[in-house]
């Protein structure tokens, strides 16, 4: 996973440490520098799905990503996002929540996707172009603006207004938005930007564009399909849509389970029928989702149940189980710690004694693997290791005993006696 953004300078390293050291959460930028253990899943997605979508843009696929809280779901989605950007795909990563954006409400989901659609950043440290209107603005300014007016008008009339899209209103709104951008019709641009985002727009303001409907809950799922179809029609390789059930209360009503199941079933069926062209759809959930929610909706259960999760031997399986890592628990923590040590060195221009810090890392990884049987111990390990490295840099290097490692994980840096009991000064 290397591209033009694959550089680790002090600023990026500091961002990574701040994110992971404060909350044990994956960094928004630079995820590749701390990624360990899921490379086999990423290789499958790259070869079996993204590369194939590049050559067969009418295809599409659905994957259910399963992992415990703190088990790397969001981290994995960040890795998939960066991989997709390398291939030129647009991405949208949406955090779902029962209050703000439940997946069973297609209108809120559409608005979230339209707001999160993003193109790859131009370089390290730069933000991606985010939001459907801005992605279309870039397209208009880079592709349409250089054309002669007659050629541009011909493309809008004969191409942008004609390729297959579920909603004719959506196709027209996107094409007219492009026209407004290149012709500097600011009033029309503002109106159509609001429409594309799913905002309420008076019908009287849409009439001059030949649009007679707005995006509402009843047609929001059609609008989401149309968004995908329009962007692929404009020449983008495809989209990777990722939904992260970050705060799902699994004790939801039967009515909401029915709505959630129906929406997911529709997506799976549309992917199977290639009606979401060039789309890889990932939905990340805790394991309880398959045990408690899916069985309540038999049609969804039949589509998601698989005798084996996705692997090199079964690349078409619908389930990506993040507990099926390529490394054991202790080796995984050591791998993460080694990556974080390299990031720490880059952030502070620090050259520690390799043997000492490798020994300290092994002690902390052993203690963490013993300390908790829950997957969430990874976050605690990450935060403790970053804090420990700060101590080593500021107070001088020392060896960490197994007893002191367990104390760090359970108590933190609370007693100066740890220096005497568990650290050996160098």
Where would I find each of the regions flagged by the language model?
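Conserved P-loop NTPase mechanochemical-coupling segment
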Residues: 150-221, 249-251
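Helical mechanochemical/support elements of P-loop NTPase systems and associated helical scaffolds
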Residues: 12, 37, 41, 61, ...
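C-terminal alpha-helical "lid" subdomain
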Residues: 179-194, 312-316, 324-426
């Amino acid at each position: 996973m290397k591209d033009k953004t694959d550089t680790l300078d002090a600023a990026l390293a500091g961002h990574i440490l701040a994110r992971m050291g404060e909350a044990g959460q994956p960094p928004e930028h630079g995820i590749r520098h701390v990624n360990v253990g899921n490379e086999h899943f990423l290789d499958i997605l790259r070869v079996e799905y993204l590369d194939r979508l590049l050559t067969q843009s009418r295809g599409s696929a659905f994957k259910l990503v399963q992992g415990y809280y703190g088990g790397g779901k969001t981290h994995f989605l960040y890795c998939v996002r960066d991989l997709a950007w390398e291939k030129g795909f647009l991405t949208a990563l949406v955090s779902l929540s029962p209050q703000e954006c439940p997946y069973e409400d297609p209108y809120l989901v559409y608005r979230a996707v339209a707001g999160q659609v993003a193109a790859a950043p131009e370089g390290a440290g730069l933000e991606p172009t985010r939001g459907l209107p801005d992605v279309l603005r870039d397209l208009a300014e880079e592709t349409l603006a250089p054309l002669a007016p007659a050629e541009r008008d011909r493309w809008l009339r004969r191409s942008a207004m004609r390729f297959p899209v579920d909603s004719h209103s959506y196709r027209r709104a996107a094409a007219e938005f492009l026209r407004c951008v290149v012709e500097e019709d600011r009033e029309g641009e503002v109106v159509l930007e609001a429409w594309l985002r799913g905002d309420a727009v008076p019908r009287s303001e849409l009439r001059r564009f030949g649009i007679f409907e707005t995006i509402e809950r009843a047609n929001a799922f059609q609008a989401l399909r149309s968004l995908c179809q329009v962007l692929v029609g404009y020449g983008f390789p495809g989209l990777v849509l990722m939904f992260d059930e970050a705060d799902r209360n699994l004790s939801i009503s039967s009515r909401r389970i029915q709505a959630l199941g129906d929406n997911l079933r529709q997506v799976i069926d549309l992917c199977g029928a290639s009606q979401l062209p060039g789309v890889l759809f990932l939905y990340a959930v805790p394991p309880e989702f398959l045990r408690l929610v899916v069985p309540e909706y038999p049609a969804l259960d039949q589509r998601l149940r698989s005798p084996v999760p996705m692997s090199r031997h079964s690349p078409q399986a619908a389930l990506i189980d993040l507990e099926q890592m390529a490394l054991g628990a202790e080796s995984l923590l050591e791998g993460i710690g080694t990556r974080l040590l390299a990031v720490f060195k880059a952030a502070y221009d620090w050259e520690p004694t390799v043997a000492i810090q490798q020994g300290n890392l092994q002690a902390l990884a052993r203690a963490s693997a013993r300390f908790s049987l829950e997957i969430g111990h990874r976050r605690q390990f990450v935060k403790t290791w970053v804090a420990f490295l700060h101590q080593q840099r500021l107070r001088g290097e020392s060896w960490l005993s197994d007893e002191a490692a367990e104390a760090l994980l359970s108590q933190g840096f609370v007693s100066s006696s740890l220096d005497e009991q568990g650290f050996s000064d160098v």
